[in-house]
Amino acid sequence: MKQARNFPAATITKKAENSLRLGHPWVYDAEVLNLEGEPENGSLVDVFSEKGSYLGTGFISYKSKIRIRLLSSNANETFGDEFFARRIQYALAYRRTVMGPTDYHCCRLVFGEADGLPGLTVDRYENILVSQVLSMGMERVKDTVYRQLVKQLAQEGVGIAGIFERNDVAIRELEGLDRGKGWYLADYLPQPPSPITGITENGIQYEVDVENGQKTGFFLDQKYNRQAVAKIAAGKKVLDCFTHTGSFALNAALGGADRVTAVDVSDTAIEMAKLNAERNGLIDKMDFIAADVFDLLPALCNKHADYDFVILDPPAFTKSRKAIKGAERGYKEINFRAMKLLPRGGYLATCSCSHFMDNELFIKMVQSAARDADVSLKLIEARRQSPDHPTLMNVPETDYLKFYLFQLV
């Protein structure tokens, strides 16, 4: 017998029940056995086991493979403004603690499921917030969440100049949501500012384009990994592949590298990287190449180009499990070429931002590339995304970024 609740009831499989009890907040479409009533797309439903035990309440999405995203397992919870105010309060308090006063001004404030706000990402660039809404349920309540963000940041003395929505990602279509981007307009927000803004990270100034830049404009998750690169760059000739707006390259240059070459296939990214180098007085020790890294690395190997530190920070080569074999080949190719380019004693920083390329598979790929390149690797550091992108240990999807720093021996 089901407990009386406030929302339409969804009964789920034993497998899904076990997953929820272990703390994973998703129920997939095939795991819903029965749905009472006709809840609106994106509305709240109560979730029950086959035996009628209440398991939680979450957003339902009829278009998505993730049919229900759990918000809370508290049977006494209400889901009005106070609920979302608490979630934002916890998220901001966590960032103030783990990022500290030097980095809180530019970090991820909300990381979806890891903050109990499924389908929502919010990044802060000084006084501009950039959001992505990736679930139908969050789309319905986003104004409540935005209002709380603006209100609570104002209480900290931070006046938000605008919220830019980067809802131009294909995953929204899987939720039945339109794609688009632009300033969010509301009576609690001023007239929108320019989408080009300035930030400072690790002592380096950047120009960030929140409208047209990759992701939300900048890769905040590599913040402390860039520090790791800067720490060992002194006196070295550095090749930064997939440089985007030059963040790893600039950290290497500021760290004392003799020479830094920044490579990206995008002419726009290269121009932005040059501007950032000029802004920081580092242009004289940097070179910039607009090229495909898969073509450039073999050419550099053939020329016996002189580098002793290579950085590989590619975009995600796969966004699905079924494409993982092709992605693995791509990762291995660039790592193999980098190892062939480097001398013994050289350094390699290599990354993957794909959740589907899990840590075990990534390490196996690196070891395979090392065998083929006839080198051994000494591990210096193994790192993850910065703590403003927290990993929930029972939600593996929140653990996505791998960063390894090796020396070739």
Sequence positions of predicted segments:
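Non-catalytic substrate-recognition/targeting regions of SAM-dependent transferases
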Residues: 112-123, 143-218
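Mobile active-site "lid"/loop adjacent to the S-adenosyl-L-methionine
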Residues: 307-337
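Non-catalytic accessory regions of SAM-dependent methyltransferases
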Residues: 1-126
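Conserved SAM-binding loop of SAM-dependent methyltransferases across substrates and taxa
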Residues: 245-258
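Conserved SAM-binding motif I beta-strand of class I
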Residues: 259-264
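S-adenosyl-L-methionine
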Residues: 268-309
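Conserved class I S-adenosyl-L-methionine
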Residues: 235-244
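C-terminal catalytic and target-recognition region of SAM-dependent MTase-like enzymes
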Residues: 333, 347-409
